[in-house]
Design a protein with these regions (language model features):
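Gram-negative/organellar outer-membrane beta-barrel architecture
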Residues: 1-152, 187-189, 216-238, 243
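Short, surface-exposed helix-loop/turn micro-motifs enriched in polar/charged residues
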Residues: 27, 147, 167, 183-186, ...
């Protein structure tokens, strides 16, 4: 594949949706791009309990190198594993909970901003976290792939518990509303807010910052270029990200002539 940020992306996956006839699902996925490189193994038992609770686990290894973007220079390598549970509370609503352990190794450079270098000097180049997550989602759109009406909402909370090195909380909420105009035309209004902060005397890890700009947040800007900036020692202006974000936008979708449902 190809994206404006990642450029050429190579990906491969092996998925079994009915593992050994049990109804369980297992997926091995590998992605490699200019910024993100990930290998992940996931397992899901959608019928873990008679009450409709699903259970799954994930193991992953992820490398992040945002130096090709206009983002402050650093690299990170993460390895982790976690367990998750999901429960449908209504026809269109679902809640989920999870607990995972993560170890992230960070590399900073002479051109990295002072807060990044200070973070590594204070906490070391390896950060370990025991992360608890909770989320809620509601999808009342008329189509998952080609929506023209309905509402999509999601909220999530992520807390690095005081068991290991990092201690932070991160929350986000997104709301999308689709208005149909007939003939496949639709107006989509989107709002997205997020807030994060360290606690118990610990800083928010800079690699947990929010960014804005680019497809998926604010079109017309390069990826992750909005927000606080700094000029590095080489004279390049780069984005720092921040602990809060608020985005509101509107998008108009219409069928491409001769493209069927493509918009």
């Amino acid at each position: 594949g190809f994206s404006s940020a990642e450029k050429v992306i190579l990906s491969a996956s092996i998925a079994q949706q009915n593992l050994f006839g049990t109804g369980n699902a297992m997926t091995l996925q590998m992605n490699t791009g200019r910024i993100n490189r990930t290998i992940a193994l996931s397992f899901t038992n959608p019928y873990w309990s008679i009450d409709g609770v699903s259970m799954g686990w994930d193991i992953y290894q992820r490398n992040v190198d945002p130096t090709s973007l206009s983002v402050a220079t650093y690299k990170s390598s993460s390895i982790g594993a976690g367990v998750r549970f999901g429960y449908p509370i209504a026809e269109d609503d679902r809640i989920n909970f999870g607990l995972s352990v993560d170890q992230t190794t960070i590399k900073v450079y002479d051109t990295s901003p002072a807060p990044y270098i200070s973070f590594v000097n204070t906490f070391g180049d390896t950060a370990r976290s025991l992360v608890a997550t909770a989320g809620w989602g509601r999808d009342r759109r008329d189509s998952f792939l080609y929506p023209t009406s309905g509402v999509y909402q999601r909220a999530s909370v992520e807390v690095a518990t005081p068991v290991l090195d990092m201690r932070y909380a991160r929350a986000s909420y997104q709301h999308q509303h689709w208005f149909p105009f007939g003939g496949g035309h639709a107006l989509m209004l989107n709002g997205d807010v997020g807030y994060a902060h360290g606690y118990d005397g610990k800083e928010l890890p800079f690699y947990k910052n929010f960014y804005a700009g680019g497809i998926g947040s604010v079109r017309g800007y390069q990826q992750s270029t909005l927000g606080p900036r700094y000029t590095d020692s080489s004279g390049y202006v780069r984005s720092l990200g921040g602990n809060r974000r608020a985005i509101a936008n509107a998008e108009y979708y219409f069928p491409m002539p001769g493209g069927g449902k493509d918009k």
